[in-house]
């Protein structure tokens, strides 16, 4: 598949990227991938939702969002695109994010299939805003190697992003904005991964630790509101890398 990825991907935008220990890198790429078979409807497993108790704030998991084969494809795609230190268009304080990342726009068909699988389990309304029938096409994928971690933080809220109709530019959507983080684990402990749990806090107290599992997705509130969830990515203690993708769940403005 490597040759297919290389021929069906391109740099669609370049932004200033923040480095893990401080400083910036100009021209950090965001890629566009035209790979129609990234997710296939016939591969869809039967997902299951499990709520997480973190003191009344919204947090839940959906199991088996992707198959192992689909997760392996996503890992191969992102490795071919190339992980790097700089995160384009994202500002984090020095020392908060210690991992490598690649940001890309997934095909609209793949994101529509992903939304179809999770939509029945998502809140249909939050703070009076209705669930948008589309996920942001921008996927922020992270690779954690031994010793990497993401220290305590609250995720920011974002507009949605996709391609212009002619596919030549990245465009920012209007009329919709993110309210939920989706963390999609592409591998897990069953692959030999050690450490790297996502820990969730409420009022400074650890309330839950979510172990990475292939195909599992974790959801929680983000942005500048009292229901946003403080969380961290624990230190990876083994030699098997951890792969996780952040995807934004959108709600109408």
Question: Can you describe what each PLM-predicted range is?
Answer:
Residues 1-219, 223-253:
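Fe(II)/2-oxoglutarate oxygenase catalytic core
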């Amino acid at each position: 598949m490597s040759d297919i990825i290389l021929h069906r991907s391109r740099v669609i935008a370049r932004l200033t990227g923040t480095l893990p220990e401080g400083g910036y890198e100009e021209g950090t790429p965001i890629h566009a991938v035209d790979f129609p078979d990234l997710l296939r409807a016939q591969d869809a497993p039967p997902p299951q939702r499990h709520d997480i108790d973190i003191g009344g704030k919204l947090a839940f998991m959906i199991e088996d969002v992707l198959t192992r084969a689909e997760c392996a494809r996503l890992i191969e795609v992102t490795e071919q695109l190339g992980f790097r230190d700089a995160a384009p268009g994202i500002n984090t304080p020095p020392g908060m994010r210690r991992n490598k990342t690649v940001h890309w726009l997934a095909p609209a068909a793949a994101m529509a299939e992903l939304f179809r699988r999770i939509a029945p389990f998502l809140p249909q309304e939050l703070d009076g805003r209705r669930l948008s029938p589309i996920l942001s096409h921008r996927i922020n994928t992270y690779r954690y190697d031994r010793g990497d971690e993401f220290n305590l933080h609250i995720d920011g809220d974002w507009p949605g992003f996709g391609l212009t109709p002619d596919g030549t530019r990245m465009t920012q959507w209007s009329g919709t904005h993110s309210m939920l983080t989706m963390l999609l684990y592409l591998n897990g402990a069953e692959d030999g991964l050690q450490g790297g749990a996502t820990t969730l806090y409420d009022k400074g107290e650890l309330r839950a630790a979510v172990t990475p599992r292939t195909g599992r997705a974790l959801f929680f509130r983000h942005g500048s509101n009292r229901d946003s969830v403080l969380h961290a990515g624990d230190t990876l203690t083994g030699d098997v890398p951890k792969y996780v993708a952040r995807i934004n769940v959108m709600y109408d403005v």
